[in-house]
């Protein structure tokens, strides 16, 4: 046991991953957080900085004294952004007392969603996953906190509407959706189809086979159709390829809007000035090099030799996304402790309650180092999302800069879509929506 604890301490110092057996976990009195990540494969340039931010935040929590004194331990498992491998990682790590799981893959989210109610492990999907899981009355164990892809798609349409002088001006316009041909890429389609009917714009859908390095045929269609705007729903190398093809075909980057997974430094750095003017939606955060969180990361984690990745990526878009994702999971544990016992290890069921009762006021977020980075988030039994706000940031050739005010997705459009889709899921799975009594559990 002493050797195992020594190994754990050394691995933390070396910024490696930590691993505890179930017995060691119980004796150590630490809260175990599984980390599903992908540092290899075609999506590694995007997956690695997210994982670095995620793991660094867990280390920062420990450096700050833990959660009411309770320290965190974690173990990474490499998924390669593969659904089957993600499920394997989930199965292996859940036995170690998993607090929650963040799959970082919509395909994996769909698969793990079926397992979570039995395993009693919350599925936390920060700004991704299945959009209808915002309905907590049906999806008791899913938490798409801080927004879904329907929120992102609606925010993009609102930004385009503002540019045109109002959403009504979209009537008769052409909008092309270039999307990753996967569950992730298909997520915005129901919202965009609904909005197309409401607003009268033409929606052209152009799937791209993963990983997305071949798009010449796609951009030939764009050149022929001449859409007024292109929405890019990509991930990994697909994004930089799309921007390069837009440049080659002469399509204005100013008329391109990416999902937030198509709006980070790896997506544009190889194109640089060629990507200038390209826009992407930002679900809460963007690049935040001046934030207090980044200053704390640099002094308390990297400054102590505990940094997981390169120091110069701290504060970049995907690093911040990983840190924000970890923070929201940690705050679920903290909220659970408020009810079930401060400083105690929380079970998956208790953390599920905490995630369902988050009340992250601006004061709380500011104290955590997220001042100017995030808006308040408040979840409930029926609302597992907690926020429907986003912004647009634009690449200026060197950095990402915010170019819009906060945009609130139209929940009069989104909520009925969430309800109807969740109800369909409940009917297919023969689920009974939760009762008020269940909401108190």
Which functions belong to the PLM regions below?
Residues 30-55, 77-84, 105, 178-187, ...:
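Extracytoplasmic "Venus flytrap"
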């Amino acid at each position: 046991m002493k050797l195992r604890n020594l190994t754990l301490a050394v691995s933390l110092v070396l910024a490696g991953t930590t691993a505890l057996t179930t017995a060691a976990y119980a004796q150590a009195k630490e809260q175990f957080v599984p980390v599903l990540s992908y540092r290899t494969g075609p999506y590694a340039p995007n997956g690695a900085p997210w994982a670095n931010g995620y793991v660094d935040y867990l280390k920062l929590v420990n450096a700050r004294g833990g959660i009411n004194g309770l320290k965190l331990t974690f173990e990474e498992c490499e998924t390669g952004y593969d659904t089957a491998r993600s499920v394997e990682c989930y199965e292996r790590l859940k036995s170690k007392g998993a607090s929650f799981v963040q799959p970082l893959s919509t395909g994996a989210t769909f698969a793990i969603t079926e397992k979570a109610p039995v395993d009693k492990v919350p599925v936390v999907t920060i700004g991704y996953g299945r959009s209808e899981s915002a309905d907590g009355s049906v999806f008791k164990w899913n938490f798409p906190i801080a927004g879904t892809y329907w929120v992102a798609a609606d925010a993009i349409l609102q930004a385009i509407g503002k540019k045109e002088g109002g959403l009504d001006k979209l009537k008769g316009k052409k909008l092309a959706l270039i999307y990753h041909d996967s569950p992730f890429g298909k997520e915005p389609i129901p919202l965009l189809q609904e909005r197309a009917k409401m607003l009268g714009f033409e929606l052209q859908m152009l799937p791209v086979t993963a990983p997305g390095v071949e798009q010449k045929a796609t951009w030939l269609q764009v050149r022929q159709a001449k859409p007024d705007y292109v929405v890019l729903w990509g991930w990994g190398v697909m994004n930089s390829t799309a921007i390069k093809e837009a440049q080659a075909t002469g399509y204005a980057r100013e008329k391109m809007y990416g999902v937030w997974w198509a709006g980070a430094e790896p997506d544009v750095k190889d194109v640089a000035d060629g990507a200038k003017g390209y826009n992407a939606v930002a679900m809460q955060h963007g690049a935040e090099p001046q934030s207090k969180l980044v200053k704390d990361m640099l002094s308390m984690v990297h400054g102590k030799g505990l940094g997981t990745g390169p120091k110069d990526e701290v504060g970049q878009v995907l690093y911040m996304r990983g840190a924000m994702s970890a923070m929201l999971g940690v705050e679920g544990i903290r909220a659970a402790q408020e009810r079930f016992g401060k400083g105690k290890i929380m079970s998956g069921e208790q953390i599920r309650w905490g995630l369902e009762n988050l009340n992250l006021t601006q004061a709380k977020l500011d104290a955590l180092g997220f001042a100017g980075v995030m808006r308040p988030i408040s979840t409930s039994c029926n609302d597992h999302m907690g926020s429907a706000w986003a912004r647009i940031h634009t690449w200026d050739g060197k950095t990402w800069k915010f170019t819009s005010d906060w945009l609130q997705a139209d929940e009069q459009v989104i909520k009925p879509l969430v309800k109807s889709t969740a109800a369909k899921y409940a009917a297919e799975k023969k689920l009974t929506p939760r009762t008020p009594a269940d909401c108190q559990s």
